Regions:
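Juxtamembrane/disordered regions of integral membrane proteins
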Residues: 1-120
Length: 120
């Protein structure tokens, strides 16, 4: 998931900064390591939670296909709904919600695929 995020935001970095309303100089201030540490820990927690959800499908149901489907369902029902509410109250642009939301869809689908391949 972390490598996907690096690739994704490298491609969409300019659009993401515009949607965020910040410049590269503004983003480079402060502790640069903290967001990456938080992201890494959060993605580990996310993977464990996703593995638990996939594992609850029952014996013989932990497959790459079911992992992808579970990741997409959890993204639609939890991640995007929460992000949409938070972004609206924060006054964020819809483009930021779409860019960040698509990132998390990619993360959950990839994690679900890998979890489905290796099992829980």
């Amino acid at each position: 998931g972390f490598a996907f995020g690096a690739f994704y935001y490298t491609l969409l970095g300019r659009q993401w900064m515009a949607a965020l309303g910040k410049t590269e100089a503004e983003l480079s201030r402060g502790n640069k390591a903290t967001p990456f540490i938080v992201a890494a820990v959060a993605q580990i927690v996310l993977a464990f939670v996703l593995a638990g959800a996939i594992g609850h499908l029952g014996p013989g149901q932990v497959t790459a296909r079911n992992g992808v489907i579970s990741g997409a369902i959890l993204w639609a029902g939890i991640v995007m709904t929460t992000m949409a509410v938070n972004h609206r109250f924060q006054g964020s642009k819809w483009s930021l919600t779409l860019i960040d939301g698509a990132h998390w869809l990619g993360v959950l689908v990839l994690q679900g695929f890998v979890i489905g391949l290796i099992g829980v």
